[in-house]
Design a protein with these regions (language model features):
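Peripheral terminal and inter-domain segments
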Residues: 350-556
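Bacterial N-terminal signal peptides that target proteins for export
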Residues: 1-11
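Short, conserved catalytic-motif segment at the N-terminal edge
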Residues: 27-82, 102-107, 111, 160-167, ...
Length: 556
């Protein structure tokens, strides 16, 4: 039996060891709990969050349910589909191979993937990383074919789609436009350079050394995922499952946990994998041929929040919403992984950061607060004032459309859940995303909408007059329109004062007239083009796919 002296010595040793060991992450913080209170229920999906401060995980907790069917709660070890947060790992893998001299970031991508067409302009590996390749986004292309958004996409199907393309959105390096196509190509590049799939390479080169034992790229949509949090979207007053089913990875595909992502966040400070040189490289901003730099680095975006520089990337697909938010000066990071389509992981991460960083952040500006709108930061406009801004707004450069409508007591983006909350008579904050919208008078007397993104990037739209359509004008657009690049035919028919697109067995798509010979649809903006007064083709602008043409089949 130990003596009193031996017991005292043992206590001293235990205390000393406890002081030297890393502190365990807290699982209680009332202020953080309040941020996630809407999800902290047994009948709701929710989120897992981890907080890293100066190399230590200081908070980790789950809110809501990983499985509503089986009553499984979310924990920091629940596995979530990371969506586009995956991109930083793909880019890091490519950077590792470049560091080892196995490829150059300035290699022509066709050196490794000859299936990419020769567009007459060199697309480099670096172009893929920074979204400056001009390659059309494959999600938009698949949507035009009628491929279901949750349907499986194999590497073979993806490469066949890419190989059919005859044009780019723009010359490589001349612009920045987000393209998931580029990051799937990067995953294929990793396989062809290293001889290992991205899943295998990341396991041995990244996840293993960092102890991220619950992370992997899921390149088989039928494979089981241990401790997976299923994803959900709202369906009236209840929830429905909304889980991706892709086999291609690189743009997404990563399953990970809040605990594992905390280990990844620490690597940006301690450089365990890659060393100092690679840590600096992956933060390098892209540069356009004009010499201008862009905020996008290696799957990471430079920005600022309340006066502090941040590096972040979010993700959204199916019902998953994810975010890694880092404050490099403070060596501070927040990871938010959600399985509810209603969650705004970016806003949640910012709110958590504000709890811990406190007065190290600048005061919230009333007009551009990144937090959710509050009574103190909004103004009330009459329905008449709101109606002045309703209408369709067109950006000819990007071929994108914004349709603004009055909804209840505010404005909204038509056919979306996004509300425009007024913070002044002319400026509005968009709910669920970090955008602001300002209305002004154009030089020609028209109304102009200026949209500002989270990194200060701006886009200008001009209000366009409503079209005058009748049965005769709509009938003039009817016919078959063919795309060899997609191997698909659209049949356009008038129906109920609109046009519809028929594509075989998939559901019809309605085209709603917006302005002269231009229609909006879930597939994008469709414009009919005339030559000598006759409609010869239609052109689709779908955000990340611009100027995509279908030729009108001749009528015999």
């Amino acid at each position: 039996m130990p003596t009193h002296r031996e017991v005292r010595i043992a206590i001293v040793i235990l205390v000393a060891c406890a002081g030297a060991a890393p502190l365990r992450a807290q699982s209680t913080n009332p202020r953080v709990d309040s941020i996630f209170s809407a999800f902290d229920k047994r009948d709701s999906p929710g989120c897992a969050v981890s907080v890293v401060d100066s190399g230590r995980t200081v908070f980790a907790k789950g809110y809501g349910m990983a499985s509503l069917e089986h009553d499984v709660p979310i924990t920091p070890s629940s596995a979530f589909y990371a969506a586009s947060v995956s991109k930083q790992f793909t880019a890091f893998a490519v950077a590792l191979l470049a560091q080892q001299g196995k490829l150059s970031l300035d290699d022509d991508v066709r050196k490794w993937i000859p299936e990419v067409p020769n567009f007459g302009k060199t697309i480099t590996v670096r172009n893929l990383i920074h979204h400056t390749s001009g390659l059309r986004d494959y999600f938009g292309l698949l949507g035009m074919t009628g491929w279901p958004s949750d349907g499986p996409v194999t590497e073979a199907r993806f490469l066949d789609l890419v190989s059919r393309q005859k044009a780019l959105n723009f010359d490589p390096g001349s612009r920045h436009l987000y393209s998931n196509t580029g990051y799937v190509l990067l995953s294929i590049l990793v396989k062809r350079v290293s001889g290992k799939s991205l899943r295998e390479y990341a396991d041995t080169a990244i996840f293993g050394p960092l102890g991220m034992s619950d992370s992997h790229f899921r390149d088989d949509h039928t494979a089981l995922v241990k401790n997976r949090a299923l994803a959900y979207s709202p369906n009236g007053t209840t929830w429905q499952m909304d889980v991706p089913g892709f086999d291609v990875v690189g743009d997404g595909g990563l399953f990970t946990t809040a605990d594992d992502m905390a280990k990844w966040a620490r690597n940006f400070d301690d450089h365990t994998v890659g060393g100092d040189e690679l840590a600096a490289r992956v933060l390098t901003r892209g540069r356009l041929t004009s010499g201008d730099s862009i905020p996008y680095a290696f799957g990471l975006i430079h920005g600022s929040y309340r006066g502090q520089p941040i590096i972040e990337h979010g993700g959204a697909y199916g019902g998953y919403r994810t975010q890694l938010l880092r404050f490099p000066v403070q060596r501070f990071a927040v990871v938010t992984l959600c399985n509810a389509a209603t969650a705004n992981a970016s806003r949640l991460s910012q709110s958590v950061a504000a709890v811990y960083l406190g007065d190290r952040l600048a005061p919230v500006a009333q007009a551009v607060s990144a937090a959710a709108p509050t009574a103190a930061s909004t103004v009330r406009l009459s329905r008449e004032q709101l109606a002045r801004y309703a209408g369709a707004y067109w950006n000819a450069k990007t071929e994108t459309l914004r349709r603004i409508e009055v909804r209840d007591s505010t404005l909204a983006v038509a056919d979306t859940p996004f509300l425009l909350v007024p913070v002044s008579e002319t400026t509005f904050r968009v709910t669920m995303v970090d955008f602001t919208v300002a209305f002004a008078a154009g030089h020609d007397g028209s109304v102009v909408l200026e949209e500002t993104g989270p990194n200060g990037d701006k886009a200008t739209y001009r209000r366009v007059p409503a079209p005058k359509t009748n049965a005769q004008t709509l009938a003039g657009f009817a016919g078959d329109y063919v795309s060899d690049e997609l191997d698909v035919t659209w049949r356009i028919e008038p129906r109920g004062g609109n046009l519809v697109i028929r594509r075989g067995a998939v559901p019809d798509v309605t085209l709603q007239p917006v302005f002269a010979e231009t229609f909006s649809s879930p597939l994008g903006v469709v414009r009919f083009v005339r030559v000598n007064g006759r409609v010869t083709r239609l052109v689709v602008g779908a955000g990340r796919v611009t100027g995509f043409s279908f030729r009108r089949a001749s009528r015999d």
